Amino acid sequence: MRFPPLLFFQDSEAVKRIANSVRGTKDDDAEIKDHSMRFIRNAISGDQQKEILNVDMLRYIAWVLVALNENIVTARTVIRERDAVEDALKNQQPEDIENFADDLKINMKYNRDLERFEIGVFDFVKYASRVTGSQYRLSNQSVIKGIVYCQKDVAIKILRESFVSNMFKVIDSIDQTTASPVLSDQTDSINELREFYKKSVYAKLTIGRGNTKAFPPCMKEIIRNLHEGINVPHMGRLAIASFLHKVGYTEDEIVEYFRNAPDFDESITRYQIKHLSGEISGVEYSPPKCETMRSNHLCFMDDDKLCHQDWMKHPLTYYEVKSRRLG
């Protein structure tokens, strides 16, 4: 398993050749095209089957994502392959892991005497901060003279996050005004993907018993960030989950709002929802009050007049008042 250099991904002629391929002529190119489009479509629908793509498919997919220009589709597609990469690395020998790390520009070596992987502290901190779990924190590793000594599972998480970072660098390096002409023969297929995305994702986000027009600005902003695949801090996730529960959303409906989170794990999400709803803990949690939202940089009142009322102390109060005003 290898990760090509940036120049490989920027080969527009190779991408155009694949885009223009027809079944029965260059079957390899046609298969790359068809398989890549299926992979993106399956990522949109939430298919979690793990599959390692070859480098030609990875390149073609990057160009299609740029032409499509839908953040959630990009995030879902990259995350789907990220999970496959992580799974594959678990079965790789140390030297193969070293080679993959080298492709990602990470200096990672396996110390056979200690049976640990060595990683520079800068790279470790950069990528470990994106992984959930205390076992991935620097404070729980052995660090000697700027070198982190970690177990294989921790090293794999570092490479997983580096893979994501490198994929987004690839995607950012491709100009959309270039991608669309290169993929002009695939315009209809790309538009079909866009329509499929809108139907499958937007439809789910409008499900629920709460009146979204009455949601306070803070909750709308958290939802927008989740919708766009932006990493929302723990307090923000707790706030929106407890808020949605309080205004009548079911567990399944709340889960859909979190599905685009970069580190989404359905089983963990469901457990946390059950906990805050009182099903597990026996205590039903309420969203944080406005003061707590402000202290955690989660208040986005801007010029909303209702937010600026002296008596406005809680997001649920906002929702109740706004709902009455909307009738």
Swiss-Prot record:
Pfam families: DNA_primase_lrg. HAMAP family: DNA_primase_lrg_arc. InterPro entries: DNA_primase_lsu_euk/arc, DNA_primase_lsu_PriL. Transmembrane segments: none annotated. Regulatory subunit of DNA primase, an RNA polymerase that catalyzes the synthesis of short RNA molecules used as primers for DNA polymerase during DNA replication. Stabilizes and modulates the activity of the small subunit, increasing the rate of DNA synthesis, and conferring RNA synthesis capability. The DNA polymerase activity may enable DNA primase to also catalyze primer extension after primer synthesis. May also play a role in DNA repair. This is DNA primase large subunit PriL. The keyword Iron applies. It comes from Thermoplasma volcanium (strain ATCC 51530 / DSM 4299 / JCM 9571 / NBRC 15438 / GSS1). GO terms for molecular function: 4 iron, 4 sulfur cluster binding; DNA-directed RNA polymerase activity; metal ion binding. Belongs to the eukaryotic-type primase large subunit family. Binds 1 [4Fe-4S] cluster. The keyword Lipid biosynthesis does not apply. GO terms for cellular component: primosome complex. Coiled coil: none annotated. Its cofactor is [4Fe-4S] cluster. NCBIfam families: PRK02249.1-3. Keywords: 4Fe-4S, DNA replication, Iron, Iron-sulfur, Metal-binding, Primosome. GO terms for biological process: DNA replication initiation; DNA replication, synthesis of primer. It comes from the Archaea.
